[in-house]
Amino acid sequence: ENVAALPLRQWKSSFKSLGLRSPLTLRGLESEGSIGVDVRRDELVESARLHLTFTLSPSLLPTLSHLKVLLNDELLQTVVLSKEQLGKPQAVDLDIDPRYFTDYNRLRFQFIGHYTMECETPTHSSLWASVSNESSLTLALRQLPQRDDLALLPAPFFDPRDNRPVR
């Protein structure tokens, strides 16, 4: 069966809808946080776009501080800001290679922060980054052909990877 002829659906979800109740706050020299994004067994990601809204501490040294964005341990982008942008909400849009997606996915954020060229306190209060839970992920999902096989039940009627509300 021609996969391109099968239905394509757009799915967009905020981090809040994915279970991140409040902004993801990363503290310290090196800290990280993540959010789960699952893809149904009978769907294939054809395209993906991350709209990331975040704020980095205004006290950071911009040449030594950054935010890494990873999907399933694949580096998507390292976000570096100028001194003028620090402390202000920022937004970046990242196109994600759909080949990085599997059934169960982990979108991870690693914060590397430095506030001085001297000896630093790893837990200093000026070392923080905040990833907004209003950030969002948009996926174009292609329906995959399914074979008639009772061994697949309860799929396609129930799929634990499906993060849509039950109807």
Where are these regions (language model features)?
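Short, solvent-exposed loop/turn segments in extracellular or other extracytoplasmic domains
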Residues: 62, 85-91
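Short, charged/polar low-complexity linear motifs in solvent-exposed/disordered segments
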Residues: 69, 94-97, 126
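Solvent-exposed serine/threonine-rich low-complexity stretches and specific carbohydrate-binding patches
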Residues: 66, 73-85
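Generic detection of short hydrophobic beta-strand segments and adjacent strand-loop junctions
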Residues: 35-39, 79-81, 90-96
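Beta-strand-rich recognition domains
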Residues: 1-67, 77, 111-167
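Short, surface-exposed tryptophan/glycine-enriched loops
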Residues: 89-108, 112-115
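Short C-terminal domain-edge/linker segments immediately following a structured domain
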Residues: 80-85, 98-101, 138-142
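Surface-exposed coil/turn segments at beta-strand junctions on protein surfaces, enriched
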Residues: 43, 50, 87, 100-102
